[in-house]
Every structure is written in C-alpha cells, then in structure tokens.
Regions:
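Glycine-centered loop/turn positions within well-structured domains
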Residues: 25, 58, 70, 108, ...
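Ferredoxin-type iron-sulfur electron-transfer modules in oxidoreductases and energy-metabolism complexes
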Residues: 31-45, 73-177
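Short, Lys/Arg-enriched N-terminal segments with co-localized hydrophobic residues
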Residues: 2-12
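A basic, amphipathic helix-loop patch mediating RNA/tRNA/ribosome contacts
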Residues: 29-64
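Solvent-exposed alpha-helices and their adjacent loops that cap or buttress functional pockets
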Residues: 54, 102-105, 140, 184, ...
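Glycine-rich phosphate/adenylate-binding loop and adjacent beta-alpha elements
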Residues: 62, 67-78
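Cofactor-binding beta-sheet edge motifs in enzyme active sites
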Residues: 11-19, 24-29, 44-45, 144, ...
Length: 231
C-alpha cells in the first residue's frame, strides 16, 4: 500500500507499506530500489549488494509474492501492498535443508552469492520445479554469478537437497578453506544464509556513505542519496 502524509493539504511524504518476512513494514519512498530500502532503511543484511543497479549478479534476489526477483532493479514503489520474502523469512525447514545441503557439498566459500541463490531455488521449489534436473538448476543459476565456488557443487546440493546429509566437521572445513585461500574462512550454515560477516554488513549505526565526485567526496546517509547528490 502507498500512503501519503499531508500537512496543511500539501503532500510532503510518501510511505510504502508491504509485508517483509511475515511482518508489515512502512518505508519512506525516496525513489530508490527495494534493495536500498531493505539494507539502508530496514537493516536486512542477508540481501547482498553485488552490482546494483545493474541487476546482473543475482546476489540481491528475494521472493516477491513468491516469485524470484532482483531487488536492486525493483523500484520500492512496486512492492506496495505486496509480500517480500528474503532468505531470513524462509521456513526453518527450508533454511536447514538448503544450508545443510550446501555445507555438505562444499557449495559455498565466501557465501556472498548464496542467499540469493537459495531464495531463487526455494521460489522454484515452491512452484513445483524439479531441481533434480540439471537443466532446471542451470536455468535458475543463469541469473546468478559466483566468483569462487563454481557451479558443480551447487548443482549437487540442489539435486540432493531432500537427502539427510551426515554431519560435516565444520572446523576442519574452515581450516582447509583458510589454507587454500590464504585468508581466514568460516564454513557453516550461517554463511550460506548470508551471515558471513562482510564489512558492509557490520557498519556502525548512523554511518555516512561516501561517493567519489570529481576530485572530492560526497557523503550522505544512504548509498542512493550519496549517488544522487554526486550527480
């Protein structure tokens, strides 16, 4: 729902209301994207910004009324009155099944792209898609980019997501990944679900965003506003 706040008969602010992960939320419409609203206004860090506003990497994929959509190219106003589901809003069973499958198959390293991939897979799964078919999985993955893991282990996880996997030694897996990459790595279900601890996800409250403009910098309270101010 789109609401207008009026003072003295003059409309001064638009409010976008929608359902996010089962809760009704209100967001000021600044003309930006759904991704900006989720991250900058609502503090949803599981939805990643990999290429905005290009809509090419799939890291910000969410479900809008049950269908996978890329949040960085979805204007906020288009979700008024609709239902938005992030990886945080998936059922506990869906989160567990998919994160366990990804961990068991080594289908993630940094975990930046996996929340969006999991959201898309779940969206297709809920609509009855057969994810045991490679062509179905590959079609879904065509909307995503993964720079470090590659597709084979993700295909394996998707094909066998319904299987109860044996436990994996996560400490040993993290140690092996650290040796392979040369930097500390954390392997576990929380990484698959977008809780890997990226710098952009742990910025202090009320931080400003700086954007280059000519020979200087422009600062604002959100990336959208900073880019707009920078021209």
């Amino acid at each position: 729902m789109l609401g207008l706040i009026a003072v003295g008969g003059i409309h001064i602010e638009r409010i976008i209301r929608f359902q996010l992960d089962g809760q009704d939320v209100d967001v000021d419409d600044d003309g930006g994207s759904l991704l900006g609203a989720l991250r900058d206004h609502l503090g949803v860090r599981s939805v990643k910004d990999g290429c905005s506003p290009q809509g090419q990497c799939g890291c910000c994929t969410v479900l809008i009324d049950g269908s996978p959509r890329v949040a960085c190219v979805t204007p906020l106003r288009r979700v008024a009155g609709r239902t938005v589901t992030t990886v945080d809003g998936l059922t506990e069973q869906e989160q567990r099944r998919w994160s366990d499958a990804f961990v068991a198959h080594g289908a993630a390293q940094c975990g930046f792209c996996t929340p969006g991939i999991v959201c898309r897979f779940v969206g297709h799964e809920r609509k009855g898609a057969d994810l045991s078919l490679r062509e179905t999985v590959d079609r879904a993955l065509s909307a995503h980019l993964c720079r470090c893991t590659g597709w084979q282990t993700i295909r394996e996880a998707a094909a066998e997501v319904a299987v109860n996997f044996p436990g994996r030694d996560l400490d040993a897996a993290s140690q092996q990944a650290t040796i392979e990459t040369g930097t500390p790595q954390n392997i576990g279900p929380q990484v698959i679900l977008g809780q890997g601890g990226f710098a952009d996800d742990i910025t202090p409250p009320h931080s400003l965003v700086a954007v280059r403009s000519g020979t200087g910098w422009v600062t604002a309270t959100s990336l959208h506003q900073a880019r707009e101010n920078a021209g």
